[in-house]
Swiss-Prot record:
It comes from Homo sapiens. It holds the Pfam family RRM_1. The lineage of its organism: Eukaryota, Metazoa, Chordata, Craniata, Vertebrata. Residues 189-198 have a biased composition (Low complexity). This is Serine/arginine-rich splicing factor 9. Belongs to the splicing factor SR family. The keyword RNA-binding applies. Residues 188-200 are annotated as: Interaction with SAFB1. The modification Phosphoserine is found at S189, S193, S195, S204, S208, S211, S216. The keyword Phosphoprotein applies.
Length: 221
């Protein structure tokens, strides 16, 4: 068996993932949702314009995190049904495993999408953060010309990404923004090749759309 272990990464440190939140959610709302399960150490809310917000909530006692998942997963909150679970991590220490010191995660999956239109400063970490709104990302990579690849642990998460994250606003760690396109791997012949099958798909219908426009707070393009 490889060094990968599909663990419930937050179980040991009291952290849980909360997804499918309403767009106007605040940290105070999350505190109100979870305070009864135990003392909360930290709330990290990810609320990007145009995307469904998600959050990480960390309890002082890991057992409280288990209770919160049991009590709030599938809970109807306004018009939203919450998704509450342990965040998945690998290798036993949390975080995302990497192919090299600064490389992308190395676990692979067949539930794969390609992304085009990334800004020049967009990294695989930025791509992973953006795309995990659809579910658990096990691999993310960025190549030249603003093209990236993302693999999900579950088929339904891949399908959700294709429906909901296509033509959404992406922001890099340097503040550059662009609108990205998300499409199935089979629809493209960008730089990625399928080494397991040795074949490539047809040309992407997005190749004819022209160069994407980037918006940078640092330099003009």
């Amino acid at each position: 068996m490889s060094g990968w272990a599909d663990e419930r990464g937050g179980e040991g440190d009291g952290r849980i993932y909360v997804g499918n939140l309403p767009t106007d959610v605040r940290e105070k709302d999350l505190e109100d949702l979870f305070y009864k399960y135990g003392r909360i150490r930290e709330i990290e809310l990810k609320n990007r314009h145009g995307l469904v917000p998600f959050a990480f909530v960390r309890f002082e006692d890991p057992r409280d995190a288990e209770d919160a998942i049991y009590g709030r997963n599938g809970y109807d909150y306004g018009q939203c049904r919450l998704r509450v679970e342990f965040p998945r991590t690998y290798g036993g220490r949390g975080g995302w495993p990497r192919g090299g010191r600064n490389g992308p995660p190395t676990r692979r999956s067949d539930f794969r999408v390609l992304v085009s239109g990334l800004p020049p400063s967009g990294s695989w970490q930025d791509l992973k953060d953006h795309m995990r709104e659809a579910g658990d990302v096990c691999y993310a990579d960025v190549q030249k010309d603003g093209v990236g690849m993302v693999e999900y642990l579950r088929k339904e998460d891949m399908e959700y990404a294709l429906r909901k994250l296509d033509d959404t606003k992406f922001r890099s760690h340097e503040g550059e923004t662009s609108y990205i396109r998300v499409y199935p791997e089979r629809s493209t012949s960008y730089g990625y090749s399928r080494s397991r099958s040795g074949s490539r798909g047809r040309d992407s219908p997005y190749q004819s759309r022209g160069s994407p426009h980037y918006f940078s707070p640092f330099r003009p393009y």
